Structure formats: structure tokens, C-alpha cells
Regions:
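An extended, acidic
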Residues: 1-123
Length: 123
């Protein structure tokens, strides 16, 4: 929990996939308890740019399209952030489930996501 103490995270609600609200809220709660704050800008590209700029430490969201993340993904990677899907792989463009964070907090974020991950989101 030390890695997430004091961190500011960002996310977006799965409004296109409301059937995933229960596991999403469990992920949210699990992270909210450990971090300093969770923000919602409403634009994945902006959240990813904020990770790249160091304004937020990590970001996750369910069900995004590649065009929502492409530019921000490049910025985040160039700044040293790691971009994965919910199981730590590289299928985020196909699954739409993305986690982006600095290396210091990524492992803990993935752990909290996996604890609450239904099989339907583990692809």
C-alpha cells in the first residue's frame, strides 16, 4: 500500500458498458481507500496526457476505443509510463480496458484491479 499512498489517480465510468458497474465500483473502492484522490476529467486523452506530465500517477478505464487513447498513450509511453490491459498484457487496444501508470504504482493498481476482475473483463 505504500506505493499508492499519496497518489492521485484518474478514471472514467463505464457508461457504454453499464453491465460492468459492479466490478468497476469495487475497483474504484479498492483504489480510493489507498490513494490520496481519484479524479475524472471526462476525456481519456487528457487523463493520459496528465499521467505523462506527472499531474496524476495512474489511470484506468473499461471499454475504450483506440482513437480515445492513441495520442495520450504515446505521450504517456514517451514520458516513461507503462500501458497495459487489466491483466498486465498488451491487449488494451482490442479489449478497451486500459491501465496507465508510472512504474512505481502500476503493480499495485493491477493487483487491485485483478482482485475485482470478472472473467468477462480478463481478456
Amino acid at each position: 500500500a505504500k506505493e499508492m499512498a499519496g497518489t492521485v489517480l484518474a478514471t472514467g465510468f463505464p457508461f457504454k458498458q453499464k453491465h460492468h458497474i459492479e466490478p468497476y465500483l469495487k475497483m474504484f473502492q479498492s483504489m480510493f481507500i489507498e490513494c490520496a484522490d481519484i479524479r475524472r476529467a471526462g476525456a481519456p486523452a487528457l487523463d493520459l496526457a496528465y499521467v505523462a506530465a506527472g499531474r496524476i500517477d495512474g489511470y484506468w478505464e473499461i471499454g475504450l476505443k483506440p482513437w480515445e487513447t492513441a495520442a495520450g498513450e504515446l505521450l504517456a509511453k514517451e514520458a516513461g509510463a507503462i500501458v497495459t490491459d487489466f491483466v498486465g498484457g498488451h491487449n488494451y487496444e482490442n479489449s478497451g480496458n486500459i491501465v496507465v501508470a508510472n512504474p512505481r504504482v502500476l503493480k499495485e493498481m493491477l493487483g487491485k484491479i485483478r482482485e475485482n476482475l470478472p472473467d468477462s473483463l480478463a481478456k
